[in-house]
A protein has these predicted regions:
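Right-handed parallel beta-helix/beta-spiral solenoid domain characteristic of secreted/periplasmic
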Residues: 39, 47-53, 71-82, 88, ...
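Bacterial N-terminal signal peptides
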Residues: 10-20
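Acidic, glycine- and Ser/Thr-rich low-complexity intrinsically disordered tracts
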Residues: 315-316, 326, 367-369, 377-512
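Right-handed parallel beta-helix
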Residues: 102, 106, 139-150, 167-184, ...
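Right-handed parallel beta-helix/beta-solenoid
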Residues: 22-66
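Bacterial N-terminal signal peptides that target proteins for export
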Residues: 1-11
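Short, T/G/N/S-enriched strand-turn elements that build extracellular solenoid repeat scaffolds
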Residues: 55-71, 86-96, 265, 348-349
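Short glycine/acidic-rich loop motifs that flank beta-strands on beta-rich extracellular proteins
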Residues: 67-68, 85-91, 120-131, 152-158, ...
Length: 512
């Protein structure tokens, strides 16, 4: 009897040993297991051999795991092996018995093209999948090493819910690629702080990168008032950083409706309809856009006329609205557009080869012909300084390097080197339209969003005058905007390894 008992004990010990040795192998095949005291839990996704074959199922499992009290401090990671995943992933932080804060979703390879989220034929709860990954009210989300393409709305979308407890703070999007999504590539809305890093986007019906509707400390915040000055949107600003991005062949390279505290640095915006375009619109909360920094970017060759039949993508917008019965569109052929912005700093950028204007700034009128219902889109207190325009004459911008509509106040231009300035009708001196720095800051209600004297915002004798912003933006048909483009050099001189891309009109498509 004693001799028989030795064999089972030996076998049992061997099995325990083998089980211990096998644990890493199970993880490698997509198993999930957490050692006591572990600081991270990984949920692996792959087409064959993993526990999870879809990203959504792994995300759901991670959310359920994190929701358990004993796992609250454990980091959760969804690791996706190379492959094409035809699905739309939703990370819903409002769900009960799920917790997604701090979740990382990443491709296992540094080559972001190895993990493809495919929108064509992807299904969602209500039909076609709208987004590659959509995260709702999740703090600290990390998205890395993926490519999202062909979705009905957006590639990667993080936003706050609208239930009064909204939050989506501190996200990080890193080494992502987005292409051919109907609206946006990397899209953040209603968030406090975040990062978009080392990523690229092309062929979007709005913009490759978007940060919008930055929330303020109070939902009732406004920059209206004359005395005393209104307080800041955020007393302790939480900044969003966009760095080392490549945005090309989109309607807009960057769009930021009512965005605030955004830094865009060391990035390239080229071959878009327009390059960097922060803007103020009634369509979203917390107007206006402002308090942003755009520094050390290359902004060039933004001459993609996406209104033409030969364009590789279509604008998702039917226009920005109506002014005087005419449809307003974003101006094309422009490097940087400050639309209705306050306290933005445009500094040390390299702006060249844009066929209309290098850097344009203007208000959205809130009176007479109304473009902004609350008169929130006033161009005030912006600084445009130390920019290099036209590559020293080798690749000039088109009509002018700088164009300003003479509205608002407190704006200034300085140390931009040799440059050209749109003069208007000559009734207002250039020194008043483009005053030097510094200037005394103004309050929004001390200045007007309408100017009829300088002939830059509107020409009442010819409302279609393309030298004015309203005449140019209401060109009809819109592809006729290019009728007033000025191509000062042909072809563009080489710049690094970039290649200029434009759309050739078909016979009769542009009527100048």
């Amino acid at each position: 009897m004693k001799q028989r008992s030795v064999v089972p004990a030996f076998v049992l010990g061997l099995l325990v040993l083998l089980g211990t040795l096998a644990t890493p192998g199970l993880a490698a095949k997509g198993g999930q297991g957490k050692k006591p005291g572990a600081k991270a839990m990984t949920f692996e996704v792959c087409k064959h051999g993993c526990r999870y074959r879809t990203i959504q199922k792994a995300v759901d499992a991670a959310g359920s795991f994190k929701a358990k009290k004993r796992n609250a401090k454990v980091k959760t990671v969804v690791a996706i092996r190379p492959g094409k995943y035809v699905e739309g992933v939703v990370v819903d932080g409002t769900l009960r018995k799920k917790r997604f804060d701090g979740l990382t979703i990443k491709g296992t390879k540094k080559n972001r093209k190895k993990v493809v989220l495919e929108g064509r034929n992807a299904k969602g709860e209500l039909g076609a999948a709208q987004n590659g990954i959509e995260a709702i009210s999740v703090d600290g989300l990390v998205l890395e090493n993926m490519w999202a393409r062909n979705y009905q709305s957006n590639g990667f979308f993080v936003h706050a819910a609208t239930d009064g407890t909204q939050h989506c703070d501190g996200y990080r999007m890193d080494n992502l690629l987005a292409s051919a999504n109907r609206s946006y590539g990397l899209f953040a809305k209603g968030c406090l702080g975040g990062k978009m890093l080392d990523s690229a986007g092309f062929h979007h019906g709005d913009s490759a990168f978007y940060v919008g509707e930055t929330p303020c400390d109070r939902k009732t915040w406004t920059n209206h008032g004359t005395a005393p000055p209104p307080g800041p949107c955020q007393r302790k600003p939480q900044w969003t950083l966009l760095k080392n991005l490549r945005s090309y062949e989109n309607v807009l390279g960057y769009s930021g409706t009512n965005s605030k505290y955004v830094k865009i640095v060391e990035s390239a915006f080229y071959n878009n309809g327009a390059g960097i375009v922060p803007n103020t619109l009634d369509s979203e909360g917390f107007e206006p856009n402002g308090w942003n920094l755009f520094e050390r970017n290359d902004v060039f060759w933004n001459n993609y006329n996406y209104f033409l039949a030969g364009a590789k993508f279509r604008t998702v917008s039917g226009g920005l609205g109506q002014v005087g019965g005419a449809t307003v569109n974003y101006p094309t052929g422009v490097g940087i557009v400050l639309y209705g912005g306050a306290n933005n700093v445009v500094k040390r950028n390299n702006v060249f080869g844009n066929y209309k204007w290098g850097i344009a700034s203007f208000s959205g009128p809130g009176e007479i012909f109304v473009a902004n219902e609350g008169d929130d889109a006033k161009s005030i207190n912006n600084q445009i300084v130390e920019n290099a325009m036209g590559r020293g004459g080798a690749d000039p911008n088109g009509e002018y390097d700088f164009w300003n509509d003479a509205t608002g106040g407190g704006n200034c231009w300085a140390d931009n080197g040799p440059a050209s300035f749109a003069p208007g009708n000559g009734k207002v001196p250039l020194s008043e339209i483009y005053p030097g720095c510094p200037q005394t800051e103004v309050l929004a209600d001390q200045v007007r969003s309408l100017d009829i004297e300088a002939g830059l915002q509107i020409n009442f004798a010819d409302t279609a005058d393309p030298r004015t912003i309203l005449g140019y933006a209401t060109s009809n048909p819109p592809q006729n905007q290019e009728c007033s483009w000025v191509r000062r050099v042909a072809p563009h001189p080489a710049f690094e390894k970039f290649v200029p891309v434009e759309v050739a009109p078909q016979p009769g498509e542009v009527s100048c």
